[in-house]
């Protein structure tokens, strides 16, 4: 059959709690990544002496690794018959890794006086490790949106979720440029 679209903005944003939480998580997840990944990381790597091909090569390798991890992500999360009882707690655990790894990366950068490791090495290693929970969380969220989407408005719920993804990326990109401009 034909699904019915939302009749008002309030109805469009009045999704189920699960859809709204996933959309908010998507905004923050991709916004937080892109705020440093779009401008800050390339500028940092250039300032560390990397050339165009090395910076572009790292970004390409990171993106390809991220895609590869997403491909195997379903095997890293046990499935439940209802599609939510194991998957939602797993998303929470993977979200903790998304918080802890950047904190460890910052701590690693602060130990420069103790451990003679170049900051670029710490950042690159940290980002490669960060790709794992980021990709698993992204994949898991993409699964969960389908589990949470209402049958009558599934396409609208999924579209709302991916619009939130785009909003997060746009926000992160704009903030990345703003931070660069502000010095």
Give residue ranges: language-model regions.
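Transmembrane alpha-helical cores of Major Facilitator Superfamily
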Residues: 60-64, 159-167
């Amino acid at each position: 059959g034909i699904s019915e679209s939302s009749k008002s903005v309030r109805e469009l944003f009045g999704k189920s709690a699960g859809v709204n939480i996933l959309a908010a998580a998507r905004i923050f997840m991709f916004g937080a990544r892109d705020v440093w990944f779009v401008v800050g990381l390339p500028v940092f790597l250039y300032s560390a002496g990397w050339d165009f091909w090395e910076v572009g090569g790292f970004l390409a390798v990171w993106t390809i690794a991220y895609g590869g991890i997403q491909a195997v992500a379903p095997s890293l999360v046990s499935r439940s018959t209802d599609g939510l009882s194991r998957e939602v707690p797993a998303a929470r655990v993977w979200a903790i890794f998304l918080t802890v790894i950047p904190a460890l990366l910052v701590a690693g950068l602060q130990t420069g006086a103790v451990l003679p490791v170049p900051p670029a090495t710490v950042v690159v290693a940290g980002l490669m490790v960060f790709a794992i929970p980021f990709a698993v969380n992204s994949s898991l969220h993409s699964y969960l949106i389908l589990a949470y989407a209402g049958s009558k408005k599934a396409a609208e719920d999924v579209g709302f979720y991916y619009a939130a993804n785009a909003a997060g990326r746009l926000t992160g990109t704009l903030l990345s440029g703003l931070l660069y401009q502000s010095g």
